[in-house]
Amino acid sequence: MALTFNRRNDRTESSEFEEKMLFVNRTSKTYQGGRRFRFAALVILGDRNGRVGMGIGKAKEVPVAIEKAKAVARKNMITVPVENGTIPHEIVGENSTSRVLLKPAGPGTGVIAGTVPRSIAELAGITNMLSKELGSRNKVNVAYAVFDGFKNLRTAKQVRNLRGTEVRPSLSSDSPAGRSATTEAGEGVADTGGMQ
């Protein structure tokens, strides 16, 4: 009866979120009458539009564990700031002894990452990103580390609002401000070089 109810929920949920099961772990405990097995499932839910959630469910049967994990993932949804298909800046997410370096990438790069960071990034709607897993590569810890990184991402507008300042134009050589700053710096160096 519970499974029928959950299946109905799946139909309504499938239109809103995509799901991906990252792994199912089986544990056993030995009793006097024999061994009893339990299962733990790690599930990611995402709408490929900046919203993603993760959950772990435990039960005596795999389908029930997956349903529990999906319910937890729905409660733990976060919004990831996605700009032009990538993240706004480089960040390191941490959990326990796992650290994950997340870096923005240009168009056409794709998601270059391990299984867990790639799955989470794709369901969040990120199409270009670089990632490196540092420390422990335990799937649960890596997943939590990726979520830690995503939670701490800030757009330029959010940083401006937090600091109460204006966002300065980029000083890259491509922008007019950057070109003038570069030429002024070059002239200053040339002038001082002549004086010596």
Curated annotation (Swiss-Prot):
Belongs to the universal ribosomal protein uS5 family. The gene is rpsE. Part of the 30S ribosomal subunit. Contacts proteins S4 and S8. Keywords: Ribonucleoprotein, Ribosomal protein, RNA-binding, rRNA-binding. One of its GO terms (biological process) is translation. The keyword Phosphoprotein does not apply. This is Small ribosomal subunit protein uS5. InterPro entries: Ribosomal_Su5_D2-typ_SF (IPR020568), Ribosomal_uS5 (IPR000851), Ribosomal_uS5_bac-type (IPR005712), Ribosomal_uS5_C (IPR005324), Ribosomal_uS5_N (IPR013810), Ribosomal_uS5_N_CS (IPR018192), Ribsml_uS5_D2-typ_fold_subgr (IPR014721).
